[in-house]
């Protein structure tokens, strides 16, 4: 496993991507631009959408990021992804698709639950995501205590997690955070969704001290600002988050806030910089699903190769520009125009 440079951990899901009318969203009390965990009342939704045209795409935020990151790296099998799957056909689909992108998969397998699924409901290029975690919910820290995973953790020089993983195995997240801090390895983290900050704030605040680079979109950043009593001004939130409690003081914390088509804000070493994303014609956008995940993938690819932050943001913007012109988190068959 000496080639593995980047370790991503998260909730492996198979996305069921479909276009729906607003009536479906209203029926299940869902909002566009939102992501939630499925409750009992949402479970009939998965069967209902299968009666229409559904595309099956590998998903899960960190898995999306790992695939895009590996796509933008010349050397394959340098990104490793882990999470928990079942023993069903969906697990095979996920493994095959993810490894076809050059990613090394080291799934924990749980035969007691089906592989997780996410209904991606698209309406006018906006989406609502409803996740039934299934086996992903059963990830255990014991996986990181196997000899194989210990070797991978030791080999990895960069770590990437997203907030969704905190609903499943917060002790695993802290375990990786501690390893990164103790060994002065960069630990990157995406806030992922406002509900995670609202309902799992104790877990988020426990992990943040280990985070060297934190990613969020404007709504996630504003939610964190409210929870921290920092207000809703993104500039203020970025500055305060950068200065917040940190375990590895050898590294300053960098804060990256994306804002869709508006400028990405980066707070680093006391300075706020704005970077404009690549403009995309509305008619060229197929699906905004995974725009944030792909930004993190591009950023991580550049960052893992020692690029300056400006170049990392450029790579993130490029990756998003490519992915939003695909359906779901589909990695293009062509080579990227920016590669490291």
Swiss-Prot record:
Q: Which UniProt keywords apply?
A: ATP-binding, Kinase, Magnesium, Metal-binding, Nucleotide-binding, Purine salvage, Transferase
Keyword ATP-binding applies: yes
Which Pfam families did the record assign?
PfkB
The record's catalysed reaction(s) read: adenosine + ATP = AMP + ADP + H(+)
Question: What cofactors are annotated for this protein?
Answer: Mg(2+)
The Enzyme Commission number assigned here is 2.7.1.20
Which pathway, per its entry? Purine metabolism; AMP biosynthesis via salvage pathway; AMP from adenosine: step 1/1
Q: Which GO terms describe its molecular function?
A: adenosine kinase activity; ATP binding; metal ion binding
Q: What class of enzyme is it?
A: transferase
Quote the InterPro entries the UniProt record gives: Adenokinase, PfkB_dom, Ribokinase-like
Task: Name a single GO cellular component.
Answer: cytosol
**Subunit structure, per the record?**
Monomer.
Q: What is this protein called?
A: Adenosine kinase
